[in-house]
């Protein structure tokens, strides 16, 4: 109900989303497993492209928005985390920061701020994570989306 009131409703999402549970009568898995349509995921991407704002209204508090796309204060094998915020993976394209969400099966919501570009990819397979912590195919999908966006311009 809270997500519907605070996020889904204001974004004008077309369909209800739902979170998976750890078992049928169990707890919601807030760390993953959000099910929604590609269009509605695209709205989340656009919300993040626009610094948490939608139609001139701040939906996600700016402080939280910024913190969520900043590396979380975590360590990975003794090294400081530089690639994950709050539900957002952090990377670079052409030395510019980007952020993206990724699903278990190759779903992506990618935000490329310096190109004013958001895209959603649904899928059934994702490549293995490379040494930088990102699936190799995310960069392939980014290249395709950038090429398509350039053709449209």
Give short role names for the model-derived ranges:
Residues 1-31, 36:
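Active-site helix/loop module of the DD-peptidase/beta-lactamase fold
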Residues 1-4, 52-61, 77:
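Structural helix-adjacent loops and short alpha-helical linkers that scaffold large soluble proteins
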Residues 3-4, 8, 42-49, 65, ...:
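Non-transmembrane alpha-helical segments in soluble domains
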Residues 6, 10-15, 38, 45-52, ...:
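Sec/Tat-exported extracytoplasmic proteins
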Residues 14-22, 66-120:
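Active-site Gly/Thr loop motif
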Residues 32, 58-65:
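A solvent-exposed, acidic/Ser-Thr-rich amphipathic alpha-helical stretch
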Residues 32-53, 107-123:
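Active-site-proximal alpha-helical segments within enzyme catalytic domains
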Residues 103-153:
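Structured C-terminal helix/loop/strand segments within mature extracytoplasmic catalytic/sensor domains
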């Amino acid at each position: 109900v809270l997500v519907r009131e605070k996020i889904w409703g204001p974004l004008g999402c077309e369909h209800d989303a739902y979170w998976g549970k750890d078992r049928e009568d169990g707890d919601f898995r807030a760390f993953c497993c959000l099910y929604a349509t590609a269009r509605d995921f695209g709205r989340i991407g656009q919300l993040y492209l626009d610094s948490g704002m939608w139609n001139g209204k701040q939906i996600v508090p700016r402080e939280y928005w910024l913190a969520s796309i900043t590396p979380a204060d975590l360590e990975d094998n003794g090294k400081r985390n530089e690639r994950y915020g709050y539900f957002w993976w952090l990377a670079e394209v052409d030395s510019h920061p980007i952020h993206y969400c990724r699903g278990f099966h190759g779903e992506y919501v990618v935000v490329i701020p310096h190109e004013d570009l958001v895209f959603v990819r649904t899928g059934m397979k994702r490549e293995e994570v490379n040494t930088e912590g990102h699936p190799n195919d995310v960069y392939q999908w980014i290249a395709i989306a950038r090429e398509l966006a350039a053709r449209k311009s």
